[in-house]
Each structure stands twice: as structure tokens, then as C-alpha cells.
């Protein structure tokens, strides 16, 4: 019981959860994130998932879907830079990407393949605007590997210190 209390306190001191009972636009979310940053100095923001954000009606009239996402992601980049925090944006794959499976004869034959950058809802804007792109993939229907997460590094902006993308077949 003491360990549980200690763990809860640790989590509360290191993480804040923004109420998920409200649907935010990216503008409202950044306003909330700024208010929290002013009160509590955090270093990272996770948006999970991006497609849970409502479209800002003012911007939606000006841009098509791709341009809208590009604009929002640019705003997130600026916020990240101005507030000196890392922002992680979780995305889901498009339906067609979920239908792509490993070929016959492959060790994962018939299992859904990991996403590529362009496979997320909103497409290439996410890969274009992000410094780094990581795909966390699980084969939940695999008889033995259902509990493992395969981490595919799809993009690394800064490679001078040794960072690099992982080979597609070797996450």
C-alpha cells in the first residue's frame, strides 16, 4: 500500500492529464498547455491521438484537410520551440494501411505491416513537420509475439550524433 501511494505521488508530480471529457481544438489545447506551463514547468506534451482534436472552424474554412493539418502541426512546432518542450503527437493509421499485411512466406505472413510515415491519417504532413517519426507496432493477433512492441524509427532529423532510422525489417 505504501509503494502504491508513493508511485501515485511520483506520477502526480511528473505528469498532468488534461481533461479528456472535453473535445479540444488544437488552439484550445495549446491555450490549456500554456496555462499549465505557466503554473508548472513541464518538458513534454503528448497528444493522443491527434485525430481526437476537433477541427478549428475558423481555420477549416480556409484550408483543405492536408493544409489544415500542416498548419496545425506548424503551430505545434512553434509552441514547442517557444515553450522549450518536446511534443509527441500520436496518430492512427488510415484504413488502407491496416489492410497491408506481410507477404506469403514471410515469418509474419498475414500479419498487419508496420505503418510508414504516409500511412497515418493526414498523410505526409506529419512526416514533413516532425523532427523525428517513430512507429510503435504490435501484432496483437500473433500467437507468440502479441505482447511485444516493435519500434520502427522512420525519421531522425539530427543524425550528426549518431541517430539514424532503423531498417524497415529490423525495428
Give each language-model segment a name.
Residues 25, 54-55, 98, 161:
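Conserved protein kinase catalytic core
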Residues 40-43, 85:
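Short coil/turn segments at beta-strand junctions that form active-site/ligand-binding loops
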Residues 72-171:
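Phosphate-binding/switch region of NTP-binding enzymes
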Amino acid at each position: 500500500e505504501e509503494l502504491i501511494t508513493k508511485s501515485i505521488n511520483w506520477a502526480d508530480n511528473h505528469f498532468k492529464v488534461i481533461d479528456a471529457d472535453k473535445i479540444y481544438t488544437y488552439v484550445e489545447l495549446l491555450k490549456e498547455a500554456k496555462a499549465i506551463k505557466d503554473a508548472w514547468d513541464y518538458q513534454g506534451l503528448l497528444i493522443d491521438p491527434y485525430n481526437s482534436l476537433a477541427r478549428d472552424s475558423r481555420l477549416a474554412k480556409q484550408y483543405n484537410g492536408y493544409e489544415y493539418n500542416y498548419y496545425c502541426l506548424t503551430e505545434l512546432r512553434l509552441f514547442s520551440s517557444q515553450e522549450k518542450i518536446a511534443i509527441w503527437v500520436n496518430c492512427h493509421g488510415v484504413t488502407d494501411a491496416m489492410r497491408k499485411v506481410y507477404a506469403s512466406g514471410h515469418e509474419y505472413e498475414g500479419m498487419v505491416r508496420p505503418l510508414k510515415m504516409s500511412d497515418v491519417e493526414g498523410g505526409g504532413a506529419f512526416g514533413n513537420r516532425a523532427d523525428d517519426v517513430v512507429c510503435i507496432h504490435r501484432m496483437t493477433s500473433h500467437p507468440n509475439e502479441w505482447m511485444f512492441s516493435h519500434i520502427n524509427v522512420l525519421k531522425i532529423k539530427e543524425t550528426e550524433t549518431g541517430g539514424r532510422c532503423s531498417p524497415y525489417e529490423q525495428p
